[in-house]
């Protein structure tokens, strides 16, 4: 049997904060894994982390959770904190590129989830530029990228939840939407698994 280890780097959204069910998008994705497969998830969340900080910590935290006897996968769930940090788009792109190139050198397969909108038009205009920059970096490396920004920027269910939460976190609907996007952007193919029929 294959042994699969998946490390997930990201922000508060990895913890499911704001979700009454406590599952978040990651728990919902994990629940859809085929039964009988040896897949271990290692979520490593850090609140308010920008890409520079993510680049600094990823190796020390992720590599110790991988094994030479397992297939090792890395999910990078990006936030929009570079905006608050005043990081330029060029620097954001470079940080992500360095992380992905490092992971490739380590023999780790990567999957990238983009930042989400916050329901604030002025802020979201910056998220849109950041998302486009991230997408370009990932596309050049032929890595899967989940664009969360464009599908959610005008979604009523998403906007209703994030604009009513004091920390602009989604709830049950929003996390379900992120999970759906992840599952339908090549998730199972990336892991080399067959999706089970849910009907």
Predicted region positions:
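Serine-esterase "nucleophile elbow" of acetyl-processing enzymes
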Residues: 1-47, 59-70
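Structural motif
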Residues: 5, 72-75, 109
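Cell-envelope and extracellular/periplasmic
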Residues: 13, 44-49, 76-84, 139
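Oxyanion-hole/transition-state-stabilizing segment in secreted/luminal serine hydrolases
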Residues: 19-22, 51-93, 118
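A general structural detector for well-ordered alpha-helical segments in enzyme core domains, enriched
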Residues: 25, 29, 61, 92-99, ...
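Active-site segments of SGNH/GDSL-like serine hydrolases
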Residues: 77-81, 99-132, 155
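Catalytic His-Asp segment of secreted/periplasmic serine-dependent ester chemistry enzymes
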Residues: 117-199
